[in-house]
Amino acid sequence: MTAQVDAVILAGGMARRMGGNDKGLVELENRPMIEHAIERIQPQVKEILINANRNQNRYSEFGFKVISDQDTGYLGPLAGMITAMSNTDAEYLLVIPCDCPLLPTDLVARMLAKLTAEDAELAVASDGKREQPVVMLLKPSLRASMKAFLDAGERKIDFWYAKHHYVVAEFSDQPNAFVNVNTPEQKQQLGEAIANEKNY
């Protein structure tokens, strides 16, 4: 039986380096950034959740359940993950950021294969050079551990998952898969990369 996988798209941050603009709604190639992520991930999962702490009505227009952090202090990606784990009954939860428009179309299959082959609790993606902490496949049963970590004042995702049996799913064959947008300059570069991808 195929494992049931839901996804959460993290769009709950402050986006300070983008001038405070809501990153998921910033347009890239004439479409909101999050729309690119949805297009890539929707065929790979059962349900999609969108974690947003502002502009919730706008995000709801994409047709998926919008969830906001249970703690409203903008505590980072971990807070969004904890909220998502409370809103899924799937066997696994895929976590992705809203600003990765070139995600692999085989992301779930490869991460799940790696995780199950090694009987791990979670899988973290890598571009072949470094791990991508906000691209993760994990068991929602890890929620209590993550909440305790956050409640202790910790924020760094990689510190948390290092405490668990995790595996790294490598995507060195797709080196641009996890390129994301933190500044207007990166947005322009990524727009050019997407345009080039369409031309091949």
Curated annotation (Swiss-Prot):
<comment type="function">
    <text>Transfers a GMP moiety from GTP to Mo-molybdopterin (Mo-MPT) cofactor (Moco or molybdenum cofactor) to form Mo-molybdopterin guanine dinucleotide (Mo-MGD) cofactor.</text>
</comment>
<keyword id="KW-0501">Molybdenum cofactor biosynthesis</keyword>
<feature type="binding site">
    <location>
        <position position="23"/>
    </location>
    <ligand>
        <name>GTP</name>
    </ligand>
</feature>
<feature type="binding site">
    <location>
        <position position="69"/>
    </location>
    <ligand>
        <name>GTP</name>
    </ligand>
</feature>
<dbReference type="Pfam" id="PF12804">
    <property type="entry name" value="NTP_transf_3"/>
</dbReference>
<feature type="binding site">
    <location>
        <begin position="10"/>
        <end position="12"/>
    </location>
    <ligand>
        <name>GTP</name>
    </ligand>
</feature>
<dbReference type="InterPro" id="IPR029044">
    <property type="entry name" value="Nucleotide-diphossugar_trans"/>
</dbReference>
<dbReference type="GO" id="GO:1902758">
    <property type="term" value="P:bis(molybdopterin guanine dinucleotide)molybdenum biosynthetic process"/>
</dbReference>
<protein>
    <recommendedName>
        <fullName>Molybdenum cofactor guanylyltransferase</fullName>
        <ecNumber>2.7.7.77</ecNumber>
    </recommendedName>
</protein>
<keyword id="KW-0963">Cytoplasm</keyword>
<keyword id="KW-0479">Metal-binding</keyword>
<feature type="binding site">
    <location>
        <position position="51"/>
    </location>
    <ligand>
        <name>GTP</name>
    </ligand>
</feature>
<keyword id="KW-0460">Magnesium</keyword>
<dbReference type="InterPro" id="IPR025877">
    <property type="entry name" value="MobA-like_NTP_Trfase"/>
</dbReference>
<feature type="binding site">
    <location>
        <position position="99"/>
    </location>
    <ligand>
        <name>Mg(2+)</name>
    </ligand>
</feature>
<dbReference type="InterPro" id="IPR013482">
    <property type="entry name" value="Molybde_CF_guanTrfase"/>
</dbReference>
<comment type="similarity">
    <text>Belongs to the MobA family.</text>
</comment>
<keyword id="KW-0547">Nucleotide-binding</keyword>
<comment type="subunit">
    <text>Monomer.</text>
</comment>
<dbReference type="GO" id="GO:0005525">
    <property type="term" value="F:GTP binding"/>
</dbReference>
<dbReference type="GO" id="GO:0061603">
    <property type="term" value="F:molybdenum cofactor guanylyltransferase activity"/>
</dbReference>
<dbReference type="GO" id="GO:0046872">
    <property type="term" value="F:metal ion binding"/>
</dbReference>
<dbReference type="GO" id="GO:0005737">
    <property type="term" value="C:cytoplasm"/>
</dbReference>
<feature type="binding site">
    <location>
        <position position="99"/>
    </location>
    <ligand>
        <name>GTP</name>
    </ligand>
</feature>
<keyword id="KW-0808">Transferase</keyword>
<keyword id="KW-0342">GTP-binding</keyword>
